[in-house]
């Protein structure tokens, strides 16, 4: 059986390589045809998931997709993307342009190469251990997790943490404090898993939430972080309505995405219409969700030239059928809304840049805690000997952060180290009777414990 399976996989790979040789992928980058955007055209043989790979390449370069026209019905894949850089200008950096050509073109390292489809966006490494966490969102969770890892002589090299509807998900890359390499001792890995599991369990008492999950594994089989966070949230069913009505989100100042799904019976398509506030990586989040739910995007039109984004998808199941029932239709709508909202972070954006050291993340979250700040989302990166961390913060009641509080924190951490980016968002506090919803804040007074989740 193993021989047969191996033979089958090798044949599929050889067939894919033959198709690429006969019809190699083609990428054209045009900076002349449009005044304000760079136009990227991609043609290739079609394959399920290719659209996601292309969108991922563009979003990982921090490019903004202003418009897109997608056609991948049948055996050919043809896309046009109008993109700008982070500053809203045409993409003129030749290093970036060459990376796009290499990643989307006929090169063997291209996302169209069969060997690269499952690894794009993943840095194969044995230099760190991957920790995946899901559980109930509650006050002080991040600080407690960081404290446990520090006590276990683990250094957090990179991390990303999301919260949504009283759920928390995190993907952390950690190393041994002494050797700065991956942790391989089975007993130590088991201890890390066990103690982190205890921390995650601490906030679920008395509420109807799923059991927390902790996974500690080698980085060799690591999934792209954004994909994994979506999958962790999806597996924890954050798209379901929990004990409070989903309409409460409007009362908390959130803007609910407008998503509709209908069938075009004459052509056996289902049409997905999305209207919501535009933001970075929005297209990736929606395309990933549809792909991960085993839908094929046959045609699509994307318009995000203004503050609102409009997305229209013509989809089918991988078996060629449209959405088959009202229950399935509602599930697609719920899952897309959840995917859009998971990455949204209201609050004041803080960026920390300083020399990296063991325990830095623990110290920073402790300072936030001592000043009664709540972090709604965090991204931790290490580049060389530098730590580059981003936090979205609010005060304990969900209101805008007081300027004096921020300045006090900057005095402690260092004004050149901690920078304020953007302004506070206007947001209402969560209802008093909603489930606890701060992943990261630890409050000075226990009287704040019953405040609810403030997210959007």
Curated annotation (Swiss-Prot):
Tissue specificity statement from the Swiss-Prot or TrEMBL entry: Expressed in stems and siliques.
The organism's place on the tree of life at top rank: Eukaryota
Gene3D superfamilies the UniProt entry points to: 3.30.70.260
CDD domains named among the record's database cross-references: ACT_ACR_1, ACT_ACR_3
Occurrences of domain ACT (ranges): 39-115, 130-207, 271-347, 349-432
Keywords annotated in UniProt: Repeat
InterPro entries named among the record's database cross-references: ACR1-12, ACT-like_dom_sf, ACT_dom
PANTHER family membership: ACT DOMAIN-CONTAINING PROTEIN ACR4-RELATED, ACT DOMAIN-CONTAINING PROTEIN ACR5
Entry protein name: ACT domain-containing protein ACR5
Source organism (scientific name): Arabidopsis thaliana (Mouse-ear cress)
Species lineage: Eukaryota, Viridiplantae, Streptophyta, Embryophyta, Tracheophyta
């Amino acid at each position: 059986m193993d021989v047969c399976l191996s033979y089958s996989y090798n044949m599929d790979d050889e067939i894919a390589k033959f198709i690429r040789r006969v019809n190699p992928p083609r990428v054209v980058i045009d900076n002349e045809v449009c005044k304000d955007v760079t136009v990227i055209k991609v043609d290739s043989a079609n394959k399920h998931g290719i659209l996601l790979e292309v969108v991922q390449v563009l979003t990982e370069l921090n490019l903004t997709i202003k418009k897109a026209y997608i056609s991948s019905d049948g055996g050919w894949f043809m896309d046009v993307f109008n993109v700008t850089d982070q500053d809203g200008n045409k993409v003129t950096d030749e290093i970036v342009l060459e990376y796009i050509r290499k990643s989307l073109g006929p090169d063997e390292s291209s996302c169209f190469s069969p060997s690269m489809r499952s690894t794009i966006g993943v840095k194969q490494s044995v230099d760190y251990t991957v920790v995946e966490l899901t559980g109930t969102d509650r006050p002080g969770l991040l600080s407690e997790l960081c404290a446990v890892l520090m006590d276990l002589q683990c250094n957090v090299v990179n991390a990303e943490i999301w919260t949504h509807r009283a759920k928390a998900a995190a993907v952390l890359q950690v190393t041994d404090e002494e050797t700065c390499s991956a942790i391989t001792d089975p007993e130590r890995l088991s201890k890390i898993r066990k103690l982190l599991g205890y921390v995650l369990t601490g906030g679920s008492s008395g509420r109807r939430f799923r059991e927390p999950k902790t996974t500690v594994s080698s980085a060799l089989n690591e999934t792209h972080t954004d994909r994994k966070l979506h999958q962790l949230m999806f597996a924890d069913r954050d798209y379901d309505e929990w004990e409070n009505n989903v309409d409460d989100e409007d009362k908390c100042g959130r803007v609910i995405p407008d998503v509709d799904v209908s069938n075009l019976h004459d052509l056996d398509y289902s049409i997905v219409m999305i209207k919501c506030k535009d933001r970075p990586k929005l297209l990736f989040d929606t395309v990933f969700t549809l792909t991960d739910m085993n839908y094929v995007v046959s045609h699509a039109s994307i318009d995000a030239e203004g503050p609102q984004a409009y997305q229209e998808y013509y989809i089918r199941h991988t078996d060629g059928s449209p959405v088959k029932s009202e229950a399935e239709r509602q599930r697609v709508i719920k899952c897309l809304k959840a995917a859009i909202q998971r990455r949204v972070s209201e609050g004041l954006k803080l960026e920390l840049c300083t020399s990296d050291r063991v325990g830095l993340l623990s110290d920073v979250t402790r300072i936030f805690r001592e000043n009664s700040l709540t972090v709604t989302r965090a991204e931790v990166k290490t580049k060389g000997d530098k730590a580059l961390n981003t936090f979205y913060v609010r005060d304990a009641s969900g209101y805008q952060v007081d300027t004096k509080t921020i300045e006090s924190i900057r005095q402690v951490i260092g004004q050149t180290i901690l920078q304020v980016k953007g302004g506070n968002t206007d947001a209402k506090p969560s209802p008093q009777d909603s489930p606890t919803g701060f992943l990261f804040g630890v409050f000075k007074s226990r009287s704040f414990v019953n405040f609810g989740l403030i997210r959007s």
